[in-house]
Regions:
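Intrinsically disordered, low-complexity regulatory regions enriched in serine/threonine/proline
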Residues: 1-17, 28-134
Length: 134
C-alpha cells in the first residue's frame, strides 16, 4: 500500500520546510506538475542562486547552482532518496509509504540545504579574501 502524494501536499510541505529561503530573500516556489512528479523552484537573481526541489518516483534532489564565469557551478546536489529504500517505492509521480515519510524526508532536505548554503557562503568569503576582493 502506498500513498500518492498530491500537489497540495507537496506545496504545503515545501512552503513549511523551505520558508527560510523566503526569509533570505528568495522568490519563487511556484509548483509545476510534471508527468513524473512535481518541481518547485526558489531563486535570487541578485546572487545568481537557484534552488530546485524536484520530486519524481525515482529520485528527489535539491540542487544549488550559481553562475561562475558564464558557466553554472554545481555547489551541491543532495540525493535524498534511495530507490532501494522500502519506504519510498517506485511507482510513478511521488508514491510514498505515507505522507509522514515524505514530510520527514523533506525536513531532512531543508536541514541539509541550510547547512550547505551556510558552508557555501563561508567558502565565498574565503574565496573573496584569498583573491584580494574582500
Amino acid at each position: 500500500m502506498t500513498y500518492r502524494l498530491t500537489r497540495d501536499d507537496f506545496e504545503r510541505v515545501v512552503d513549511r520546510e523551505f520558508a527560510f529561503l523566503r526569509d533570505a530573500g528568495f522568490g519563487g516556489a511556484a509548483v509545476e506538475r510534471r508527468d513524473d512528479g512535481f518541481l518547485a523552484g526558489f531563486d535570487r537573481a541578485d546572487l545568481g542562486v537557484r534552488v530546485h526541489c524536484d520530486l519524481d518516483c525515482e529520485d528527489m534532489m535539491t540542487v544549488v547552482a550559481r553562475p561562475l564565469l558564464g558557466r553554472e557551478l554545481l555547489l551541491e546536489t543532495i540525493h535524498a532518496l534511495n530507490v532501494g529504500d522500502s519506504r519510498y517505492p517506485s511507482g510513478g509521480g511521488g508514491s510514498w509509504r505515507s505522507l509522514a515519510a515524505f514530510e520527514e524526508r523533506l525536513a531532512l532536505e531543508a536541514t541539509l540545504l541550510r547547512e550547505n548554503l551556510t558552508a557555501a557562503a563561508g567558502n565565498d568569503a574565503l574565496y573573496e579574501e584569498a583573491s584580494g576582493r574582500a
